Amino acid sequence: MTFSPPSKQRIAFLDQAAATYHKQLDGSPAAEYLRKRGLSQDSAQSFRLGYVASPLSGHERYAGLLAIPYINRQGTVAIRYRCISDHDCKEIDKHSKYAREPGDDAKIYNILTLTLPVPRIAICEGEIDTITAWQSGIPAIGVAGAQNWKPMFNRLIRGYTEVITLADGDTAGLKLADAIAEKNEHATTCQMPHDLDVNQYYREHGQAALLEKAGF
Ligand SMILES: [Zn+2]
């Protein structure tokens, strides 16, 4: 397979989409969702989170979803969309909690963290947990599920004195942590208490508790 960088047009389109949906965030159901999850307006701004109120052409299927741009030095390289309804997404036929565009492969979320001069970083499962850790003062990257941690990503986390995977408090939560620990001697796992993810832990116990638990 030959390497082809994302085209300039594609990045320009995604930048425009991210900016458009970010403008539609204020006062939207997505803003309310973020507020309930304890994510600050500052975070919504830095991560350019958005709401798809009026979708751009081709994005009709994402209407009503939270828009989560994946941003690197070139710009927006992907946007993932998350259902923000109160229902249990698994209970609904042919519906999933997350949507991504065709051809959008596994990527690291908040990859710009890797440009920071810090000795230790955290790895989270999911974008919301990554933002939660970040706004708490933890330099964090994330992937959307254990199956999205690709072997080539191990190269990106060499050179740190320690990488700490902040794992969900269930068996599935350890999958990502174990996949990372298996290939990285400097990786450790910090698992949240039973049935809590990083965001829930933060909401129940607060920022100071999360920092202490994660060791940052
Ligand atoms: Zn749903």
Annotate each predicted stretch with a short phrase.
Residues R10, A53-T161, L176-A177:
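Phosphate-handling DNA/RNA-contact segment within nucleic-acid enzymes
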Residues L34, Q74, T165, V198:
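A residue-level signal for conserved active-site and pocket-lining positions in enzyme catalytic cores
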Residues M1-L66, T115-L116, N184, F216:
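TOPRIM metal-binding catalytic domain and adjacent DNA-binding surface shared by DnaG-type primases
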Residues I123, Y160-A172, Q191:
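Acidic beta-strand-to-loop metal/phosphate-binding motif
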Residues A140-I141, V163, H186-T189:
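Hydrophobic anchor at the start of a short beta-strand
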Residues K175-N184:
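Short, aromatic/basic amphipathic alpha-helical patches
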Residues A144-W149, D168-T171, M192-D195:
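Short, acidic/turn-prone active-site loops that include or flank metal/cofactor-
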Residues E204-F216:
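Metal-dependent DNA phosphodiester-chemistry modules and their immediately adjacent helices/loops
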